[in-house]
């Protein structure tokens, strides 16, 4: 005889069993969706990275930037140099003009948007190329806020101030920072190890030797100190720059007349970097003493002064050749006079002309630039293989 209660119970059991089976079947899908969500969140977090760089006031800041950016705007040649060395130069969509030979692949690429110069950016052009990130140098710090409205701005400096980290450590730190944006930090260590070995060989050669370091510009010879341009010669390589004191003394007088510059400064308003100019030394506006620094283009010195210093070596950087000044007198012509030729350094063939002045002047701080700079010194000193 049919039992209604048992039948009802049986139906409830079947329904419960079916529900249990359904939940069991759904569980992997639900858990899978949860895991997918977690992975998506993790992937999203991995799309940005936090780096340390400078803001428009030259203060160190933590900046969140895209990880592995695909569209890069370049307004700093040292940064382009580093990106090129890391093999990610194909991400560049716009750049400032340059005449540096080893960057000609970029300057001659008509697909790249011209963005102005390293001194003055074309904001409309920068917006046009729709960058994920923008790299700038010292001369564009005043445009930092405007550029930041377009994309994150990475402002790195070559810290050649008198009490700064110097060229080598600046390259190491800046290259590592840029590499971290692509997960390529390990590549920098190997590159810098080779540079460290070359610096050590140059240091061994320079030990106990004196030098005058200078820049030829507008027909004159300007002495440089152990900061700013060419500071690697007196600081990292270790030549005793016998003109450094005179440069600082004269620059202190200039500073009190209100001079200022841009190259090789430190964060927090004490100067600027890379392709920029030198900063002046003496006293701050409050009358407090500040660190000795070299002026924008060094300090003009008479040839009598250079002769009286009687250095073992004279290093010469040709500014007019670096910037392509038409009709300018070349450094070799300026230095070809009786006073200079009477010097012991000239008679010993120890006047070293830096063969790639545009690299020294506009791209200092890059990896390939450092290679060229060290090669100029090695060749000039007879150390090249």
Q: Where do the model's predicted regions map?
A:
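A short, structured surface patch at a secondary-structure boundary
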Residues: 71-125
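Proline-aspartate-enriched helix->loop->beta-strand connector
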Residues: 130-136, 310-314
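Extracytoplasmic substrate-binding proteins
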Residues: 143-219, 276-284, 350, 359-385
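Ser/Thr/Gly/Pro-rich low-complexity, disordered linker/stalk segments of secreted
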Residues: 254-286
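Bacterial Sec-exported substrate-binding components of ABC uptake systems
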Residues: 2-78, 186-216, 263-267, 272-276, ...
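Structured C-terminal subdomain patch of bacterial secreted/periplasmic proteins
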Residues: 71, 170-173, 180, 305, ...
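Short helix-initiation/N-cap motifs at beta->coil->alpha
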Residues: 56-59, 115-122, 249, 293-303
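Alpha-helical, coiled-coil/dimerization segments enriched in small aliphatic residues
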Residues: 101, 227-256, 282-297
């Amino acid at each position: 005889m049919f039992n209604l209660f048992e039948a009802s119970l049986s139906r409830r059991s079947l329904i419960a069993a079916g529900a249990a089976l359904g939940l069991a079947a759904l569980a992997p899908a639900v858990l899978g969706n949860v895991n997918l969500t977690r992975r998506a969140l993790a992937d999203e977090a991995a799309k940005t990275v936090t780096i340390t760089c400078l803001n428009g006031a030259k203060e160190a800041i933590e900046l969140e930037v895209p990880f592995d950016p695909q569209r890069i705007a370049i307004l700093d040649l040292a940064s382009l140099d580093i990106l090129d060395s890391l093999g990610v130069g194909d991400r560049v969509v716009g750049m400032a003009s340059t005449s540096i030979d080893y960057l000609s692949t970029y300057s001659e690429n008509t697909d790249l948007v011209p963005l102005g110069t390293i001194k003055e950016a074309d904001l409309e052009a920068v917006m046009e190329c729709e960058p994920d990130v923008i790299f700038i140098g010292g001369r564009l710090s005043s445009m930092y806020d405007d550029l930041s409205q377009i994309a994150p701005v990475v402002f790195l400096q070559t810290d050649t101030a008198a009490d700064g980290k110097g060229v080598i450590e600046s390259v190491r730190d800046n290259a590592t920072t840029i590499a971290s944006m692509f997960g390529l930090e390990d590549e920098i260590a190997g590159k810098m190890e080779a540079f460290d070995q070359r610096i050590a060989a140059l240091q061994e050669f320079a030990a106990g030797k004196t030098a005058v370091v200078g820049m030829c510009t507008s027909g004159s010879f300007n002495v440089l100190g152990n900061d700013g341009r060419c500071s690697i010669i007196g600081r990292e390589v270790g030549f005793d720059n016998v003109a450094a004191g005179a440069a600082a003394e004269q620059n202190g007088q200039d500073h009190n007349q209100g001079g200022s510059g841009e190259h090789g400064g430190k964060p927090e308003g004490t100067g600027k970097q890379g392709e920029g100019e030198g900063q002046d030394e003496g006293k701050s506006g409050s009358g407090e003493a500040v660190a000795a620094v070299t002026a924008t283009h060094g300090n003009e010195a008479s040839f009598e002064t250079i002769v009286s210093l009687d250095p073992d070596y004279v290093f010469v950087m040709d500014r007019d050749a670096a910037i392509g000044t038409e009709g300018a007198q070349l450094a070799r012509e300026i230095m070809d006079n009786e006073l200079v030729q009477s010097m012991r350094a000239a008679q010993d063939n120890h006047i070293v002309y830096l063969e790639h002045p545009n690299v020294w002047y506009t791209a200092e701080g890059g990896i390939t630039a450092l290679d060229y700079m060290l090669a100029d010194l090695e060749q000039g000193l007879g150390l090249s293989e």
